[in-house]
Amino acid sequence: MGASLKDIACKLNLSKTTVSWVLSGQGDKKGISAETQSRVLACARSLAYEPNLLARSLNTGVSKTIGLILPSISDTFFAHIADRIESEAEREGYSLMIAGSNSETERENALIRLFRSKKVDGIIIAPADASGREVGRLAESGCPVVLFDRGLAKTDAGCVVIDNEAGSHALVRHLAARGFRKIAIITTFPHLPTMELRHRGYLRALAKAGLHADPRLYGEVAYAGYRQHVCDTLDRILATVPDTDGFFFTTHILATEAPVSYTHLTLPTT
């Protein structure tokens, strides 16, 4: 076990309070001499002292830790974002606690409560709960919250998102402009605002092109076991509407599964 504040204080014949102030960076503010501060720091190094971060956060109200909640840690999209967030956090002197919600509301809410109990200084989250109740309570409590990828209409938290409706509208309009007329949509988590907006963009693009939104060309995939579900959904659509000539996937995870089982098909990819 490493040395404690008491060990350092006894060795230097100082009070624990003085040692604590120096090690927490408050030496100058508390009027402690430069010589005493140097002695404390040197002693801490020689005794391999490691601060109790939880105790420090309780005393100062600052943990220098940010909680990050992702829908999926294994998803390359979110993994890349986590990597960039961690780099920026480290640049500012913060460490990151990362957890995955599996896009499950109950798990997400439990993680929010867990991070709060760990006294994190803020939480960054791609929310799974479309109601935003727990995130809303978090924001109201005064804890800094930033949403990304998925916004919540009833929450005042800061949010970083793209224009999902405009993006999907442009993509489907591009397919229609190339002459494709029976464009299917494959989606997941339809309750999420992000997916609702992408579906809305799809429907708007079809209407703009004078195309009928055929319900047979709609596929909804459960995330659990999505690999098989994507193939089953494609089978069902192609069996029902054999002349389907285009597919719009609302997320890259679904899109990357299609070529695996359908390399023999000639379908638009741009």
What is the predicted function of each stretch?
Residues 102-105, 126-131, 252-254:
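Short beta->alpha connector loops
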Residues 46, 87-92, 116, 139-147, ...:
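Bacterial carbohydrate/catabolite-sensing allosteric modules
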Residues 1-62:
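N-terminal helix-turn-helix DNA-binding module of bacterial transcription factors
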Residues 98-101, 124-127, 142-152:
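Short beta-strand elements of ligand-binding domains
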Residues 18-21, 59-72, 183-189:
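Short beta-strand segments enriched in small/hydrophobic residues
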Residues 69, 99, 125-126, 186, ...:
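Structural motif
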Residues 122-123, 246:
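Short, Asp-centered acidic motifs that coordinate Mg2+ and/or phosphate
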Residues 1-4, 45-77, 81-83, 91-94, ...:
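N-terminal helix-turn-helix/winged-helix DNA-binding helices
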